[in-house]
Amino acid sequence: MMKQISILGSTGSIGRQTLEVVNSFPEELNVVALAAGRNRELFLEQCKAYKPLLVSLQLEEDALWLKEHLIKEKLRPEIRYGLDGLVAVATCHEAVVVVTALSGAIGLVPTCAAIKASKKIALANKETLVAAGQYVTKLAEEYKVEILPVDSEHSAIWQCLHGENRSAIRKIQLTASGGPFRQLNRQELENVTPEMALKHPNWSMGQKITIDSATLMNKGLEVIEAKWLFGVDYDDINVVVHPQSVIHSMVEYGDGSLLAHLGMPDMRIPIQYALSYPERWFNHLPKLNLTELKGLTFEEPDTNRFPSLSLAYQAGKIGGTAPAVLNAANEVAVHAFLAGQIKFMQIPSIVKRTLNEHQFQGSPVLEEILEIDGWAREEANKIIRNC
């Protein structure tokens, strides 16, 4: 039976790779709704190729431009824009699965709307669970909605848990490549430029997540995401640097068994599994050749050089609104770094200072989380202006 899917963030890295998976399985997958940000030219081509019923762009002017160009192609989907447009795509009646491939906390509201519409969630937008993990997981439980992880590490953990008793878990071993600056000293890190940071050694990703990988904040966000996806305490989630990115994560059980998920560093594999689950579909992607591996190495992350990882653990353990502040401040700091406004090593400093200014709240509802998100962005921007 063909699965009807909506994609939030179709012009981003994960969105484009999701469409590549769709192209490989034309009998199994069909796109019924698409949403994107500002890349209207690429979005136009996607609309022409997939002919969705409902589409949305960030700005009204881009939506009007899109409508004009689609009419020329004799295509007349429903066209929306802004946050209302994201929610419309997330709740599209025909869709069974919603791929949340947006970058940042902007994914929170449409993801919650999709859950309330009883859509299955293929989650690539980790910031949703970072900012509002307790709220979102309770909402999913209330509406009996499955959240299927798309992140390679969480997909790996999920697969290592199949058929196992969660109470038998001793530790989750979350692997990290270590990023492009794993071997740089503190002084060298001070001189890192955006161009240097955007060259990830193993993965093809968007700009924001690539910078997060370089600071190890991405791994910190994944720790918080893992806590909510799998119900494991922070003390039982361990990060290990694995530069080859062959083992995508591991689950250690109480009897001493360690189950690992191995594969090529290709995001299309976990995307495909989230869309095919509970089945596995054959594909023509490059396969891992064990005899070609020169070795698998592991090391402890250096939180002195990369303090973002420790900040994420601290915020996660505080709970409540702390992870939302962490996430929002980090988004602002990363964008400031990409714009040349701050140095690489100022990113964690700005996040820490924003966290220190916040009065934490426990068990916030969605409206409170969104309010705190806005406050944290303003506070981080204020700190940046005074740098």
Swiss-Prot record:
Its cofactor is Mg(2+); Mn(2+). NADPH binds at T11, G12, S13, I14, G37, R38, N39, N125, E127, G206. GO terms for biological process: isopentenyl diphosphate biosynthetic process, methylerythritol 4-phosphate pathway involved in terpenoid biosynthetic process. It is an enzyme of class 1 (oxidoreductase). 1-deoxy-D-xylulose 5-phosphate binds at K126, S152, E153, S177, H200, S213, N218, K219, E222. GO terms for molecular function: 1-deoxy-D-xylulose-5-phosphate reductoisomerase activity; manganese ion binding; NADPH binding. Its EC number is 1.1.1.267. Pathway: Isoprenoid biosynthesis; isopentenyl diphosphate biosynthesis via DXP pathway; isopentenyl diphosphate from 1-deoxy-D-xylulose 5-phosphate: step 1/6. InterPro entries: DXP_reductoisomerase (IPR003821), DXP_reductoisomerase_C (IPR013644), DXP_reductoisomerase_N (IPR013512), DXPR_C (IPR026877), DXPR_C_sf (IPR036169), NAD(P)-bd_dom_sf (IPR036291). It holds the Pfam family DXPR_C. Mn(2+) binds at D151, E153, E222. Keywords: Isoprene biosynthesis, Manganese, Metal-binding, NADP, Oxidoreductase. It catalyses: 2-C-methyl-D-erythritol 4-phosphate + NADP(+) = 1-deoxy-D-xylulose 5-phosphate + NADPH + H(+). It comes from the Bacteria. HAMAP family: DXP_reductoisom. Belongs to the DXR family. Catalyzes the NADPH-dependent rearrangement and reduction of 1-deoxy-D-xylulose-5-phosphate (DXP) to 2-C-methyl-D-erythritol 4-phosphate (MEP). This is 1-deoxy-D-xylulose 5-phosphate reductoisomerase. The gene is dxr.
